[in-house]
Amino acid sequence: MSEEAKVQRAVIGRVVSDKMDKTRTILIERKVRHPLYGKYIRRSTKLHVHDEGNEARMGDKVMVQECRPMSKTKTFRLVKVLEKAAG
């Protein structure tokens, strides 16, 4: 019996909260087209991310990847910090 490998989503977002231990909250923004008027609208999603080494800080741009559920709300883990926040 062969098992298919699940595709793990990788997304880029900005850290909006680093107050929890080993957990960061990131904001992912995307543009979607309005179905009737055609105007592009910004939509956002907040995710809780597992950060084992507490590497990411507020304002950092990070790449995260989907993983097994770590808790009730955490299903993503930090892959790397792409860009440090100014300051």
Swiss-Prot record:
Pfam families: Ribosomal_S17 (PF00366)
UniProt superkingdom: Bacteria
GO molecular function, one term: rRNA binding
Protein family (similarity comment): Belongs to the universal ribosomal protein uS17 family.
PANTHER family in UniProt: 40S RIBOSOMAL PROTEIN S11 FAMILY MEMBER, SMALL RIBOSOMAL SUBUNIT PROTEIN US17M
Lineage: Bacteria, Pseudomonadati, Pseudomonadota, Gammaproteobacteria, Chromatiales
Ranges annotated as spanning the membrane: none
SUPFAM superfamilies for this protein: Nucleic acid-binding proteins
Gene Ontology biological process terms from the UniProt entry: translation
The name this protein goes by in its record: Small ribosomal subunit protein uS17
